[in-house]
Amino acid sequence: MFAILHEACDNTHDRKKVYAMKFELMHPADQLVMIMNRIYQYGMTTTSGGNLSIRDESGDIWITPSGIDKGSLTRADINCVKPDGTILGPHKPSVELPFHRDIYRIRPDLRAIVHAHPPTLVAFSLARKIPDTHLVPDATLVCGNVAMAKYDVPGSEQLGKNIAEKFAEGHNTVILENHGVVCGSTNLFKAFMAFETLDFCGRLEIDAKKLGTPRSLTDAQIELESAKAHPPMDAFVARVISSEECAGRRDMCHLIHRAYDQRLFTSTQGTFSMRLSDGSFLITPYMKDRKYLEPEDIVRIKNGMCETGKTPSRAALLVQEIFNTHPEINSVIIAHPPAIMAFAVTDATFDSRTIPESYIQLRDVKRVPYASSSLDIEGTANAFCSSTPVLIVDNKCVIVAGASLLNAFDKLEVLEYSAKAVIAAQDIGKIINITPEEVKDIEEAFHLT
C-alpha cells in the first residue's frame, strides 16, 4: 500500500503540476503535503506545530505525523489510520489524532480537518475572543458561525471532547483557548479556505482597531452579497487564440501568484482583468485557487459573451463597464488586502500624501458605499478618472485601475504598503503628510494632471 506513497511529488514544482490535474483527484497524502507546505510557507504554523487529516471513503484517516519537520514534509511521511486503529506509515501519527477521530465520529459529513497555530488566531485565542467575520461579506459564508472550545492539554481525551462538543453543535470552525484553531469541511481545500479566511479576518480586525472602531455588516447586508448571481452571459467558442491573448494569460497568472504570495489575495478572493486589443478582455474565474491558477483557467469575455465552459468572476460586468467607460484603462484589479481594508471597515480616511511614490501612483483615493460595485455598476465606473485610479468600497474591497496589467498591480502593491505604513505609524506618533506645496512640486516634476 505504501509503495504508492513513495512515488513522491517532493518539490513545489511537482506539487503544482499535480494540482493542475484537479486537487480533488490527488491522493490524500499529496493533498496533505501540499496544504501543510502552504500553511508553513506563509508563517501560519511552526516546524513542529499543526496537523491536518483527511478521512477517505473507506473510513481511513490520513494524517500528518508527530515530530516531523512541517517545512519539508513528503507524502512518504503521512500516516494512514485504519478504522480498527491499525496505523500504517513510518512515523507516529499526530498526538492530536484523538480529536480528529472524535470530530469525524460525531460529524460524518466532514471529510477533512485543518489544525494550526497562526500567530493572529493564537492572539485571539489568548484573549478568548473570536475574530469578527462580519467585517467583509464572504467571511461568514466561508467560516460559518465560529465557536470557542475550552482549554485542555494537547492530545488529551478531554481536549478532544471539548472540540467535538462544538462541532456537534454544528460549528465547522472552532478556536481553541490558548492554543489555535480547528476547521473542518467536506474536503481539505474548503477546510483550508475557512482557516485562511478566519486568519484574514483576524489580521483585518487588528489593523482596523488601530485606526478606529471596526464597522460590522448586518446579516441583511451579507445576505445581499451572498445572493449576488453570476452575470447572465451567452457562451462563445474561441476558434483562434492570439499571441497577445496567450501572453496576457501567462502574465496574469504570474502576477496573480505574486499577489497571493504577498498576501494581497486569499485562495479564492481577488480578481485580475486585462483588456485585449480587439475589445475583449481576460478575467479570473470564479472560485478557483489563486495560488495555482493556470493560463487555461483564465476566462475571456467578448462582446458580452463568456468563453464556453467557464465561469468568470462575478465582477465581470463591473470590469466590462469600466473598460467601456474608460478607454485609457486596460487593467482592473479587485482585491481585499488587510491593511487597506482596515480603512474600508472603519471611518478612517486613507490619504496618499505620505511619500512621493504613494501620491504619484495613487493620487486621490476615493471611497464608495458598500454594495455599490454590485448595485450601481455605472456609478462605480464613473467614479474613476485620471486623478482617481483607486476606489475603496466600504466593507468589501478595493478596485484598482491601470494603463496596463503591471501598472495596476504596481498600484495595488503601493496601496497596501502605504496602508501598512500608516497603520504602523499609529504606534509611533502623529503622521505629518506632504504639504500642498510639496504635492504641487511632485505634480509638476512628474507631469501629473
Please provide the spans of the model-predicted regions.
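Glycine-rich flexible loops
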Residues: 19-449
